[in-house]
Amino acid sequence: MITYTKPLSKLIGHFEKFPGIGPRTAQRLALFILKQPESTIREFSKALLEAHSNVGRCKKCFNLTSEDECEICRNTERNQKLICVVAETKDLLALERAREFKGVYHVIGGLISPMDSVGPELLEIRSLVERVSKSEIDEIILALTPSVEGDTTSLYIGKLLAPFTKVTRIAYGLPMGSELEYVDEVTLARALEGRTKLN
């Protein structure tokens, strides 16, 4: 078993907490950090603290932003009557890369998962219903991961929003359990085009 000095071991341990980072990658990152000049480390630390302090959630759609409303919600050229519901900001970014969607978003912050003790009350679903009920919305597009949790969440939201507007779900050319952030732009564009009606 490899033994590290305590400060290095602690640094590696912090990197291992990052999603998708295993022990080897954590070690590589820690060793890379140690090779950098102190000025670079100070700039990096400052950037981390600034992002953590100044980036919050859009009061309208819950996307990440440093303003009250995110850039997408403020954009008057976007179709404000077309809302795409995603689980996380990373899914929003994946759809934006596809350059197909011209509406706005609502980030619910996860998926309903009883096994993980995540119920609807822990997600931004109530705020979505309020947003739709108070506005003239032509269509809600559900772009949630094709999984048991994604299906459960889509059906739940679909039932809540059915009295207010048309609800559709994007078509998928990918296997169950796939993460939207890893899907290529062409597949995502086709998924948006081929969406199906839920209500």
Curated annotation (Swiss-Prot):
The keyword Zinc-finger applies. GO terms for biological process: DNA recombination; DNA repair. GO terms for molecular function: DNA binding; zinc ion binding. Pfam families: RecR_C, RecR_HhH, RecR_ZnF, Toprim_4. A zinc finger (C4-type) spans 58-73. Residues 81-175 form the Toprim domain. Keywords: DNA damage, DNA recombination, DNA repair, Metal-binding, Zinc, Zinc-finger. May play a role in DNA repair. It seems to be involved in an RecBC-independent recombinational process of DNA repair. It may act with RecF and RecO. Belongs to the RecR family. This is Recombination protein RecR. The gene is recR.
